[in-house]
Amino acid sequence: MSRRAVTAVFLLISAAIALSSCALQTEMSPEIFLERLAEADKTLSVDFDGRYYSGDRCYCFVSDGGGTEYVLSMQTCADGSVQSVSLASTAVDRTAAFISLAGKVTSVYSPQEDIKAIVSALFLDGKVGERCEYYNTRRYEYSSASSENGLYFSIDDLRLGERSTPALTLGDLSGYLNRTKPSAQ
């Protein structure tokens, strides 16, 4: 085989792999997302049995190696694919751990994105204060919020539909972490 033929075959295989990973990304169910997140960070404990659905949202509780508990909320499209992912915690004293987990959520949900740029734009100095930050790419909208009540992070896949409604508010966090159903919004 000539060098050109080998190069052409390599490019075709690379393009096929890239296209298949994009196709897998848009067809990720909440269960697959949670499995991939657990695989990405072996220190996370994902409560698969405790997850529940409310309308088009799947809620799941996750705790890290340090014992901090988080709430993950995944909004799904009509076909069951994850359209948005939200992460929340009331542990404002564990901001660094929250930022690290937000980076892992980003790497699983939108692996082709510049995770370092997103996390640094959203969390700036890593300090907690009453503020919201947004970061947009061609395909995703990222947002974060922090207050004395908790920390919040979300990713919306803009190609899968309109921007989702907020999964939860910072005021809802203590209820979520006490294993109650979400309040009416």
Predicted regions mapped to residue ranges:
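Bacterial signal peptide processing site
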Residues: A23-Q25
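Post-signal peptide N-terminal segment of mature Sec-exported envelope proteins
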Residues: E31-V46
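Short glycine-rich, low-complexity/disordered patches
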Residues: K42-R57, S110-R138
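Long, charged/polar, surface-exposed segments that mediate recognition or autoinhibition
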Residues: T76-K127
